[in-house]
């Protein structure tokens, strides 16, 4: 990474990513200027304390930040809107200067590390003794794997597992444990991409890189993949949009000499929009619905940004229930005297899988199962166009999952598919999947009051997330849903169908409540208005019947009434707690 030394770079935006890029360049001997439109961004004190040699400039992003200066490269923070940075970016490109982001630097760093062993990196003093992350040595221990269900055999044992009647054993016994189901088997029938060479090999550092994006479900799937990979016995680092940043995490592992076998990256459309030469081992686009159109300009640009995660040759994991995602699969390439060459991929979805290597859900005798398909007999040669006979492998019952809703079942399938593509064995991952409790504020069960369960989905800040939560949770019971907030210019009409099918009533809050009411007017569901979250919870409780659920999934940003989505969640939880106390229920 000596090519980074003695460079003069400009970083636009002092957020978490901007600070991480400044740290990265400084550690490699560059001269750095950070520019921000804000006079005193929140991380300015941190920048000045950690990196006193870095110059900070506040004010509008104008061409003179690069024109007539010594700057030789420009890097932007992902949250900055293209229109805001356009004067600088356009000027830089006109001068022939490279323009990139944190993902580009991370990709280049991994490419550089392939050329030398991790030991040589340390010997060359390319890493300083201190890390920007105080808990660097614990990064690969991203999940607690102290307990695991005992080894199971067959579908009867899985059914027992679903009811929680299985004896537990230590994590060390699980990594090489028996399959959870006779059908689970090993992974020979699936497109595994094998594990990387260890970091200390002379051949250089060659990790598996797994990348996740999508409008909704990114954080859940990223966190789950990290835990499953670790359960499969591999060292793992989880970074990106989920936090911590890509470069801070890489720096911490370099400092601790703990480069992981597998990287699991959550990437937003902002990070992917201008990414260059990013080629992960395997990647998934979970779904694409309207979001961030004010940033991208239109839906086509938003979809194109998401699709960049697949690079040129990355193994693709696709949501077959989402037409926009399936359109990302390239057209088969015609080859003379051979069948058309299809890009390596597999799919997941809420229905039964239809081709070998795909994942889905199958219902047998009233019990829904996570399943995958394999070719029944791989030794049989088939004629062109002849249908493949499938063997459906039952992996585990949906009831064994602690994360709720059909949408989370498909998230689980996506996580399994991505981890299997990294060469991870299925058996230990199924144990880990059963233990995963989900992420805060994402269809999180917080209380049961008088036989009505209350769910916090405050992270449901767009229509797609709320539609998925309604369909997923509504498959089990009727819902009273709390909607509303700052709508970000979204079209709320896609909520009409899931509300009509799954909601008993809707309570509306916030700035864009009138727009949501208009979109749901024909749904024939009671629409109620509330001036506060406390009133919304009271109205929802009054509308709910025994066995129903109250779902706070606003489909909107929170800034009209709250500090952020976490504050909104806390106010909701406090209101439910107060309701329980009023009704004499101890939580």
Swiss-Prot record:
Pathway it acts in? Answer: Cell wall biogenesis; peptidoglycan biosynthesis
Which residues bind ATP per the record? 214-220
Report the enzyme's class at the first EC level: ligase
* InterPro entries according to UniProt: Folylpolyglutamate_synth_CS, Mur-like_cat_sf, Mur_ligase_C, Mur_ligase_C_dom_sf, Mur_ligase_cen, MurD
What GO terms in the biological process aspect are recorded for it? cell division; cell wall organization; peptidoglycan biosynthetic process; regulation of cell shape
The principal location of this protein is cytoplasm
Q: Which GO terms describe its molecular function?
A: ATP binding; tetrahydrofolylpolyglutamate synthase activity; UDP-N-acetylmuramoylalanine-D-glutamate ligase activity
Catalysed reaction(s) here are:
UDP-N-acetyl-alpha-D-muramoyl-L-alanine + D-glutamate + ATP = UDP-N-acetyl-alpha-D-muramoyl-L-alanyl-D-glutamate + ADP + phosphate + H(+)
Provide one Gene Ontology cellular component.
Answer: cytoplasm
For this protein, the Enzyme Commission number is 6.3.2.9
The subcellular localization recorded is:
Cytoplasm
Query: Low complexity composition bias: which ranges?
Result: 132-147
Annotated keywords = ATP-binding, Cell cycle, Cell division, Cell shape, Cell wall biogenesis/degradation, Cytoplasm, Ligase, Nucleotide-binding, Peptidoglycan synthesis
Q: Please state the span of the N-terminal signal peptide per the UniProt entry.
A: none
Region (Disordered), start-end ranges = 124-147
List, alphabetically, the Pfam families matched.
Mur_ligase_C, Mur_ligase_M, MurD-like_N
Family of the protein in this entry: Belongs to the MurCDEF family.
Q: What does this protein do?
A: Cell wall formation. Catalyzes the addition of glutamate to the nucleotide precursor UDP-N-acetylmuramoyl-L-alanine (UMA).
- NCBIfam families (alphabetical): murD
Q: What is this protein called?
A: UDP-N-acetylmuramoylalanine--D-glutamate ligase
Q: Which organism is it from?
A: Polaromonas sp. (strain JS666 / ATCC BAA-500)
